[in-house]
């Protein structure tokens, strides 16, 4: 079968390989991927900055954002059936008894990222208990479930932490970044009734800006210093340390900032001491969140259905580029105007 692979730690080793078709073990299923989404993590792996091949393999099959059909059941599987359309979660625990999305590094593997082959192939295998069934009416956009699950968990964590202190009911939110995570954060928070302001670098006539406004949110294409006022909740989705610190300035007393970006090492942060002192004196909370479990995938699908009802084809317009396996290199190229690129693998019969 064909699979999109890299040799981890070797920059620009991306290639399409012919590899053996996998077989499901006990508790596993064989999947026939329909499509996979591509994100910044894939870019880092291709650049040799991250990633690990499974034991005994020189290469790693990419693809952690997947929509697939159940093709074959291994022994002991009774929660899904052949023909079900599903999305798989990403992480699998090793020697960790915590919810898998809270396991520390070294105690888990991740499909298409770390120690476990992904789904950018004609077939893949995964553990059945980490599959979430997709309703027929959401199949066209369900490839977005994985990034949406990250948003769902991040917002859930922020609300849980904020509400553990007193009855905290955020009314306003600042979203930093308008990539898939920033836009999906805006969508979820608008569905929850919050007033949102989304800040990014694209011009006000860009697709990203229009998508924000179509949700009823405010879009700002300038520096954070031009924004007045404070916000109960801040979602940081840029991966810029300076933007994160500047966002803290706009966090209201008793507010919560959730970090969904991944930050580069080093660098000098302007006025960090004053910003942190202000955070202490005003009981501001800063919390990081990564990955997601089954419950947040399920919540994401429920919000997808609600978004379709309220915002029409909004979700489908996040997919700005599609490519096939035979043209896989096009899928793994990036421009500033791309939002979500999808690799089409198998047709849905």
UniProtKB/Swiss-Prot annotation:
Positions with a binding annotation for substrate: 41, 110, 146, 291
Enzyme Commission numbers on file: 1.1.1.47
Required co-factors: Zn(2+)
Domain of life: Archaea
Pfam families the UniProt entry points to: ADH_N, Glu_dehyd_C
GO molecular function, one term: NADP+ binding
Record's protein name: Glucose 1-dehydrogenase 1
Species annotation: Caldivirga maquilingensis (strain ATCC 700844 / DSM 13496 / JCM 10307 / IC-167)
GN (gene name): gdh1
